[in-house]
A protein has these predicted regions:
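A broadly conserved detector of short glycine/acidic/proline-rich loop/turn motifs that flank catalytic sites
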Residues: 130, 201-203, 242-245
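A conserved ligand/cofactor-binding region detector
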Residues: 199, 204-206, 212-214
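N-terminal beta-alpha lobe that positions the nucleotide/phosphoryl donor
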Residues: 1-198, 207
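Non-catalytic terminal extensions of PLP-dependent enzymes
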Residues: 102-103, 205-206, 217, 221
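Conserved small/polar residues in nucleotide/adenosyl-binding loops
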Residues: 247-253
Length: 257
């Protein structure tokens, strides 16, 4: 298991009115928040501290509002539904996902999720944030699942069901074949990996039956494919109208709502 300490160990406790509260990043449960959530909060604080405020008084750096379901909820879910042994079974990803969908989420977590969907009607990204994700020595980028949900159904029960299904799918991806194969290559014991889940608002605007941001992109501090006169240490930015992914540009990428 990684010996590195997380960049951010924990977040303020989730408040069931958090979407309009003081804290944009909160935590459900008492376990770890995982590498991705820790990195998001760390880089937000780092960049905010380096802004030249006098020159850019109106610039605000933040991460989209998010609640992180800590790893203790994953442990409870796996234990109470007797799913731990699936990591050793030769099952297809579809069968593993089906087994996880049949499981019941912890009662306290269900209460928090219901409170969330009553308030929030914007599209959401349900993102993995495992203990090993975004580690420097063995980055797990792209190994686990992310689900994007419209979250615009008029019935709160429907929004709740879609959210619960998405969380269970991200949990299930911990046991998918690609994840298990990758874990073996790192020398990590299967039981040492645990999953936190980020529930995060998707930034953008509704345009007709689509929802997307004005622009989006990815910035890297080092460019491995720099052409002169650019230098590798100059970095590189991929920018697009709408949404941009690591593999392709779209004009725009969609979330139908």
């Amino acid at each position: 298991m990684s010996s590195l300490k997380p960049l951010v160990a924990e977040l303020p406790v989730f408040d069931r009115k958090f979407w309009d509260g003081t804290f944009r990043c909160t935590q459900i449960g008492s376990g770890a928040i995982g590498g991705k959530a820790s990195g998001l909060v760390f880089i937000k604080d780092l960049l905010a501290a380096q802004i030249d405020r006098p020159s850019f008084p109106d610039v605000e750096i933040n991460v989209p509002t998010m609640a992180v379901i800590a790893t203790d909820c994953f442990d409870q879910f796996v234990a109470q539904n007797r799913l731990a042994e699936l990591r050793f079974e030769e099952m297809t990803d579809d069968r593993i996902a089906h087994a996880f969908q049949k499981g019941d989420l912890p009662v306290e977590l269900l209460g928090d999720l219901r409170a969330l969907v009553v308030q929030v009607k914007t599209p959401l990204a349900i993102r993995s944030s495992s203990l090993l994700e975004d580690a420097l020595e063995h980055p797990f980028a792209g190994v686990y699942a992310t689900k994007m949900i419209p979250n615009n159904q008029p019935d709160p029960d429907s929004r709740f069901r879609r959210l619960a299904e998405a969380i269970k799918f991200v949990y299930a991806s911990t046991y998918f074949r690609e994840a298990r194969d990758y874990i073996r290559t790192t020398g990590t014991k299967p039981g040492e990996e645990k999953m936190a889940v980020i529930i995060q608002e998707i930034v953008g605007h509704r345009r007709g039956d689509r929802f997307y941001p004005d622009i989006s992109g990815v910035a890297r501090s080092y460019n491995f494919y720099a052409f002169e006169p650019a230098r590798p240490e100059d970095g590189v930015v991929t920018l697009a109208l709408g949404s941009v992914s690591y593999t392709h540009l779209t004009l725009p990428t969609i979330l139908r709502v």
